[in-house]
A protein has these predicted regions:
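Structural preference for solvent-exposed beta-strand-turn elements
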Residues: 1-362
């Protein structure tokens, strides 16, 4: 089990296709009662270890696409790993199960070494994971504009903010840090890489992690694992300016009612070219509807506490559904601007905000 978990931690960077460069696969070294595992694909490098009975120190580089799946299928209990001197093969044995894999020259593997970064911050793993989950969905998946595929991490004194956008919607979450970081600044990390990081985090209530960064790299240290990633170069949009300072309407809705209304209209929206949904705020109600002559029409209305002018406005239905999937509590608050962005605010979590730009309706 320890061997499987260690291989799983570094798998993301292992480049297990045999046709790639020399650094592909798993670098494994054994000494002083532990086995260290590394993988490096030049965009990320991961290093972890597990305890072991080491009879003789040594290291191997295994370019084995099926190594992890093979180890997973071995019976529970001790696994013996052995490479005989002068041979380019490594053997794994568990009970009556035996496998061997070819090895490559370890001298050409780019080792993952800890970088002495200037800036450091410590925080709870669960807080970091929550922040990533609450904003990453808003990032773009279009590699043509790499800035928007990333998440901005903005650290200013004891306030840590994450923001993600695809230029049509933006999600931002901030927390107050228990420890003051060694410096302030911001950096951009791929949203998919941060998802990889949080999949590896320990889940204990008080488990801590360290984040350290410099001009080109960010490192995440937690438990037995060190995760190093390249940063995305470029200037991120000023997320604070995206949120309007004034609105024409404030609407407080029952979250469950709003979810059901959007869900009811969404089948029509999903079949339309621009996947739009219309909202009409008036007379203490919110009407949600969409129609297309070739598809049909769906509409419903729910009670709403309204403060401001009547507004009719259109949004991308998927973008509205996305924030509702990440919302909690009994109520949700919409701050609406005629022909302008709508800010979605959580009644029970003011530090989590979402803004979405309108679309042209019928």
């Amino acid at each position: 089990q320890d061997l499987c978990r260690a291989l799983e931690r570094v798998q993301r960077a292992a480049q297990t296709k045999v046709t790639s460069n020399t650094n592909n696969g798993f670098f494994i070294s054994a000494e002083d009662g532990k086995v260290e595992f590394q993988a490096n694909d030049y965009s990320i490098g991961i290093r972890t270890f597990c305890e072991a009975d080491v009879e003789e120190r040594g290291s191997v580089l295994i370019s084995a696409p099926h190594l992890l799946s093979t180890i997973k299928m071995m019976p529970s209990g001790p696994v013996v790993m052995e490479q005989k001197k002068g041979e380019s093969t490594v053997f794994f044995k568990a009970g009556q199960y035996n496998s061997h894999f070819p090895t490559r020259d370890t001298a050409e593997f780019p080792l993952v070494t800890e970088i002495d970064h200037t800036f450091h911050v410590n925080m709870k793993c669960k807080d970091f994971a929550e922040m990533v989950n609450l904003v990453s969905f808003a990032a773009s998946t279009d590699a043509k504009n790499p800035i928007f595929t990333g998440i901005l991490c903005d650290i200013n004194e004891n306030v840590f903010t994450m923001a993600a956008t695809n230029s049509h919607r933006l999600a931002a979450r901030e927390i107050s840090l228990e420890e003051i970081p060694t410096g302030k600044g911001n950096f951009i990390v791929s949203a998919s890489i941060l998802q990889d990081v949080i999949r590896l985090l320990p889940v204990g209530e008080d488990d801590m992690m360290e984040i350290s960064w410099a001009s080109r790299h960010v490192a995440f240290s937690f438990g037995e694992t060190y995760f190093l990633s390249n940063l995305i170069n470029g200037v991120y949009p000023d997320y604070k300016r995206v949120f309007p300072s004034s609105f024409d309407l404030h609407a407080t809705l029952d979250l469950k009612d709003f979810e059901e209304a959007v869900r009811f209209v969404s089948p029509i929206s999903r079949d339309m070219s621009y996947k739009t949904i219309n909202f009409k705020f008036e007379n203490g109600t919110l009407e949600a509807f969409e129609e297309d002559p070739d598809i049909g029409r769906s509409e419903t209305s729910i009670p709403a506490e309204l403060d401001g002018a009547d507004v009719k406005i259109t949004f991308n239905c998927t973008y509205v559904e996305d924030i509702l999937k990440h919302s909690k509590g009994e109520k949700i608050i919409l701050h609406v601007k005629k022909n302008g962005p709508m800010v979605v605010e959580q009644e029970e979590d003011k530090a989590y905000r979402y803004v979405v730009t309108p679309m042209r309706g019928r």
